[in-house]
Regions:
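Soluble extracytoplasmic domains of inner/organellar membrane proteins
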Residues: 124-191
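Generic structural motif
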Residues: 46-48, 115, 140-142, 154, ...
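Aromatic-capped interface at the extracytoplasmic side
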Residues: 18-33
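Early exported N-terminus immediately downstream of N-terminal targeting peptides
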Residues: 37-88
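Hydrophobic membrane-insertion alpha-helices, especially the h-region
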Residues: 2-19
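Low-complexity, Gly/Ser/Thr/Pro-rich intrinsically disordered linker/tail segments
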Residues: 185-204
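Mid-length scaffold segments of soluble, non-membrane domains
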Residues: 77-150
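Intrinsically disordered, low-complexity acidic/polar segments
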Residues: 50-52, 119, 146, 158
């Protein structure tokens, strides 16, 4: 009986490892595909002080307002990335102006870069961890908590209190992902890593 139990336990562990590897591979494939279809927006505060965090949100609003007014309509993701790359001076100027208007003299930088992001949920959309292209705005020492959203497709909150993202942005995201990929990113939780051990042990 003990040998039988150990055999089943080893089989269950091997099954779990195989399932984990398959799920990890599927998540990596999803992340790679998703990364090619979005442009994220990342604002890093000077520090975690209340004043610096408040300033971060004001800079965020200024940059989003600037881009909403200037970004041509109907661009695809690659054209949006290129537009952002060629307009970083204007984006930085908008951020700098907001910083000065609020009585600070922090330096600020703006660049389109590739950065690593951990798993993040924004509204009802979850992005798996990995490298993504992002418009990155750094205020001062950029050591404070960051704020992020997705510029393309537009998933930046319309209602920050209730975490409502624009339906148009979600529809664009749905168009470029498979049905299963879209289901995964809108499932409202972390990506599942399924192990068969509990089920197998429960059947003993």
């Amino acid at each position: 009986a003990v040998i039988c139990f150990l055999s089943l336990l080893i089989a269950a562990l091997l099954t779990g490892m195989i399932t984990w590897r398959i799920d990890q591979g599927a998540e990596a494939k999803l992340q790679e595909h998703l990364a090619g279809e979005v442009l994220r927006f990342h604002v890093l505060a000077n520090s975690d002080s209340e004043e610096d965090q408040t300033l971060k949100l004001k800079v965020r609003d200024a940059v989003l307002d600037t881009m909403e007014a200037a970004l041509p309509k109907g661009l695809d993701v690659e054209a949006t990335k290129e537009w952002a790359r060629t307009h970083t001076d204007g984006i930085r100027a908008a951020a700098e102006r907001t910083i000065r208007e609020n009585g600070y003299d922090y330096p600020v930088s703006a660049a389109v870069t590739t950065s690593y992001f951990p798993d993040k949920t924004y509204g009802d959309v979850t992005f798996p961890a990995g490298n993504y292209t992002a418009l990155r705005v750094e205020i001062g020492e950029a050591k404070g908590q960051n704020w992020w959203c997705v510029l393309y497709p537009n998933l930046c909150f319309l209602d920050a209190v209730n975490a409502v993202v624009p339906e148009e942005g979600k529809q664009k995201l749905e168009q470029v992902l498979t049905e299963e990929e879209y289901r995964q990113v809108t499932a409202g939780g972390k990506f599942e890593i399924r192990f068969k051990l509990p089920e197998l042990l429960g059947s003993l």
